[in-house]
Design a protein with these regions (language model features):
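Feature marking well-ordered beta-strand scaffolds used for ligand recognition
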Residues: 1-178
Length: 178
């Protein structure tokens, strides 16, 4: 028999979204891929520390539309940001690094692009937070490369760099590989 759930609350501060990213350490949800938001399609910050009473606390529109993101409480190699809440946005034509610790004043740390950009779709930190692995969803289709994974060196969040590219031996579109 199927289980039927009862609604605890209905949050109406945004319409559709591509994804909702949650940082369990901070108790915040980040809505990404939501065109038509007051933040130019950038992440929307929702306090879900009390899940039945979510609170809209702001957003980050400075770098434009974020299709996907990862948000972590940072304990990586860059000591300038230890303990800060860091958002890495896959923003269609670049990767954005932002400090979102202060929800009323998010700050761009840096951003980085790469050659043959088609659609910066998603990415994920390595466990040690030294590297960020990116999938460009449409480069195989529009540029004609084999499936490409980009590995960025994030040892210094102010100065990220492309470490290397990995090409597989097929031409599959890499959608949500990480």
């Amino acid at each position: 028999t199927p289980v039927e759930f009862e609604v605890d609350t209905h949050f109406t501060e945004f319409g559709r979204a591509h994804n909702i990213v949650i940082n369990e350490d901070s108790g915040y949800a980040y809505v990404v891929g939501s065109n038509g938001s007051p933040f130019n399609g950038g992440p929307i910050f929702i306090n879900i520390q009390n899940p039945t009473e979510p609170i809209l606390e702001g957003g980050f529109g400075e770098e434009g539309y974020s299709h996907d993101a990862q948000v972590v409480t940072y304990y990586g190699p860059d000591s300038d940001y230890t303990g800060k809440e860091i958002l890495i946005g896959s923003n269609e034509d670049k990767v954005v690094i932002a400090d979102v610790s202060d929800k009323s004043n998010p700050v761009t740390i840096s951003n980085i692009d790469y050659s043959n950009i088609s659609y910066t779709h998603q990415g994920w930190f390595t466990e040690d937070l030294r590297y960020f692995i990116v999938g460009d969803e449409l480069d195989e289709q529009f540029i004609g490369t084999n499936t490409r994974t980009l590995i960025f060196d994030f040892n210094d969040l102010d100065n990220p760099s492309l470490s290397f590219e990995y090409f597989s031996d097929n031409t599959s579109i890499d959608h949500n590989g990480y």
